Amino acid sequence: MGTTASAAPQATLHERLHSDSMTDSRRSIQTLGIHNNKAKSIITNKVAPVVITYNCRQEFQIHDDVLRTNYKVGRISDNMPEHHLVQGSFFMVQDVFSKADVLNTTASYGAPNFRQSGGGFPLYGMGQTSLGGFKRVLESLQTRGHQEVIFFCLREEPVVFLHLQEDFLPYTPRRKENLHENLQHLQRGASSEDLELTIRKELHDFAKLNDNMFYVYNDIEHLKGEPQKICICSEEDIHITEEVYRRPRFTMPAYRYYRLPLPMEGAPMEEQFDAFVKVLRENPSLSLNRDASRLLPALLFSCQVGVGRTNLGLILGTLVMMHLTRTTAEKTTPAEEEVKDEHKIQFRVIESLIGKLPKGQEVMEEVNRAIDLCSEMHDIRESIYENKQKLEGIGEDYQTQGSSTKDYFLHGALQSLERYFYLIVFNAYLHEQYPLAFACSFSQWLCSNAWIYRLLSCMNQSELRAPADLVTKGARVLVADEYLAPDVLSTIKEMKVANFRRVPKMSIYGMAQPTSEAASVVLAYLCDEKRKHSSVLWVNLQDELLLEANNQIFSPREPTRVEQCIRVCSAQPEDIQSLEASLKAQLLASQQWLEVTLEQEKQMKMIKSCSTVQEIFNQLKSSHHALQYRRIPFPECSAPSEEGFDQLLDVMKATLAEDSLSAFVFNCSNGKARTTTAMVIATLTLWHFNGFPEFCEDEIVSVPDAKYTKGEFEVVMKLVRLLPDGQRMKREVDAALDSVSETMTPLHYHLREIIICTYRQIRSCKSDAELLALQALLYLERYIYLILYNSYLHLEKRDSWRRPFSVWMQQVAAPAGVYELLNQLGFSEFEDLRDSTLCRLRRRWLQQNRHGLPFRGELI
C-alpha cells in the first residue's frame, strides 16, 4: 500500500498548466477533510504515514529524516543539561562577549571596535556585528558620504545568526575543551558558506526534536545560568553570513560583499592574496585608471573582535590606497618617530628580502607607514618585538619547565614576522603588477620568484646566536662521529675514516667526517705514486658545528635527541667557523669533565686538545701545498639551494682551470646523503669538462614498480617533456647516480631509488608518516634539481657557465614553468595532491627547516 501510494502517477505539465484553479480548490478541500477526520484510512509503514482520503486526487507521503539521523548529544559539565551537538562535537557559543569591545563602539555604531584607519583613507574596521548592528554600520558610512562600500568578511570559521527578539545575533560552534577559541579548518575542502548551511539544517533539526528549542551559551566566562534556550521554529530563524552581508546590495547598488577568509595568525596563503587582487581587478574604482574626480570607495573589514585579521585587512587596504593616491599620506609626527625608534632593529631575513627586491627599502618603508596608520588596536611589528623579548627573557635554567612557554613565544614571534614579511612581498608585487592591471596573479608572481620562499624558510636563524657555553653548562652534549657514522663500507681499518669510496674511473672521492689523522692518510693516498694527484680540492658539506677533541670528531647535540643534527640555518661558512672557534675556546677554558656520547656508551671526558676543522686543514696545507679546502653547507635530505650549486661549480671551475687532473674530495657527517649528492654534481660537471662516457642501454628491471625505481614519476616526466632534449638530460643524471652508487651498495643509498623506497614506508610507519612524506618529497625534489642542473650545464656551456645556476633558474627556468612544477610536487600516481600541503614550495621548504629542538639562541 505504502509503495503504491508513493508511486501514484503525477499530472503532466500540460494538465497542471491548464488546471491550476481546480487543483488549488481541491487541495484546500482535501486539507480540510483531513483535519476534520473524514479520511477513509491512515496506513502507516516504516517510512512515514500514508494518508488516503475520500475522492482523493493526490496521495502523498511525509518523508522526515530527523528521527532517523544519528545525531550526537553531550554536555559541558555533569550539572548541565544534555543536548545535541553541532557536527557531533561542538557547542554553539555567542560570538562576541561584551569585554571584547575595547573601543566601546557597539552602542554608538552597532559594531564592536569600529574605527577608521589613519591617513585620511576611507578604510574602516570592526568586530562581528548582529544583523541590526550591520545595518547601523552601513547607515553610518552613508552618513559620512560613502555611497560605494566594499565589505570584506575576513572570517574562515562558520558563523550563524539566531533570531532573538528584534535582531539576529551571531553564534559560532566551539569545542568543549576551549569555548573561547574559534574553529579552524573544520572540514578539508568545505567552504565556510557550505558549513554554515549544514549547521543551519542541524540546528533546525535539533529544535524540532526538542519542542522548537535549542541550547546556546552566552556567558562562557562563568557559565552562570548556562546553557540558555533559544526558540527556533523554522530555518528562517537562522541566517547565515551570506544572507546577512549580501542582501544590502538590493538597497545599496554600489555596495559589494566579499568573503576573504584570513588566518588568525601568520601570513595568508597565496590563494587568499589572489582573491584580494581579484577584487581590485573587478572594481573599476580600485583601478589605477579610475575616474579621479570620484571619491574612493570605502573599504570595510571585519573579523570576530576586529583586531588581528581586521588589522591585516586594513594594512592591505592602506597599501592599495597608497598606490591609488600615489602618496604615503601625511608625515609622522616627531612624537611618533620617537616611539618607533626602539623598533628600528631589523631582522636578518627582512634585510635579505629588501636587499633583493627592487626598491626594497622604499617598499618596506611604505609597509611600515601602513602598519603605523592602522595600529590603533594592534601593531604587527610591536607583536614581533614583544614576543622576541619575552622569549629571550626566559632563562636557560628554566628550560625544562619553561619549554612550552618558550615555544609559545617563539611561535608568536615567527608568525608575526611571517605576516610582516608577506606584507613587504605583497607591496613589492603591487609596485610591479598594479601598473600592469595585475597581468600576473600573486601566486604566479611569487612562484616565479621562488628565492622568496628560500628566505622565508630561514626566518629562524637563532642558532647563529646560541651561547658557546651550552655544552659546558650541560644544556647540550658532545656526540662522537663514531656514534653518528657507522662504518658500513669497512674502510676505517685502511683509510682511518668511515665509508671512504671513489667514483669508478674518476678522481672523485667521498667519505664521512675525518679526523686530522684520517685526513692526512687520505691525502697521502691521493698523492701516492699510483694516483699521482698533484692537487686536491676538499669540500666539507657539513652545516652543523664540528670539533676535533682528544683526536675524535664531536658535534654538539641536544641530550634528548642526540641523533638529530643542529643545523645552522642559512649560515655562511664564516659564520659556522666563528661559532666553532667560540665553542673550542669555551671547552678549553672550562677544564671540566664533560659527558660525551661514544659509539657504545656515554663517558665523562676532560677536553685536553681541541681543533676546529678549518685549523686541521690549515695545518695539512703546510705539508700538502696544493690542497684547497672549502666549506659549502648542504642540507641533509634535500637538494642544495641554487646558490649551493653555484658555489660548488665555481670552486670546481677554478680548480680545473689550474689543474685538470685535480682530485675532488667530499665529506659530510657519515659520507652518505650529502656526500653522494655532491659526488653526483661533481660527476656531471667533470663529464661536461672532459666528455661523457658511452652509456649502456637500460637494463630490464624485473622488480615491482620498476619505472618508479628508475625515477619515472609523473612530475619527473612532465619536467622531461618541458626541458630541451629532456630524455637525454634525465638519462645522463641516472648514469651519474648509478656510477656514484656502484661502490656503495652496502650503504643501501641510491639517490633515485630511495624516493620510492621512502614513499612505500609511509603506510607501514604511521607514527612517522608525516616525516616520511616530507622526506620522500625532498628526495624527489633533489632528483629534479639534478636534472635541472644537468640541463643548465648543457645550455650554458657555450658561455662557459658565466651565468650562475641560480640566475639561470630565475631568468630561464622560472618563466618556463619549472617552479610551477615544483609548487605542485607530489606523487600524483598514488594520491590527490590537494590532500597534502607539502606539495607546495612554501610549506615544504618551511617544514624542511623546522627541527623542533629547544630554542637556545636569539631571533636576529
Swiss-Prot record:
One of its GO terms (cellular component) is cytosol. Keywords: Cytoplasm, Lipoprotein, Myristate. Residues 1-24 are annotated as: Disordered. Its main location: cytoplasm. One of its GO terms (molecular function) is protein tyrosine phosphatase activity. It comes from the Eukaryota. Coiled coil: none annotated. It is found in: Cytoplasm, Cytosol. Pfam families: PTPlike_phytase. Signal peptide: none annotated. Residues 13-24 have a biased composition (Basic and acidic residues). The keyword Lipoprotein applies. Belongs to the paladin family. PANTHER family: TYROSINE SPECIFIC PROTEIN PHOSPHATASE AND DUAL SPECIFICITY PROTEIN PHOSPHATASE (PTHR23339). This is Paladin. The gene is pald1.
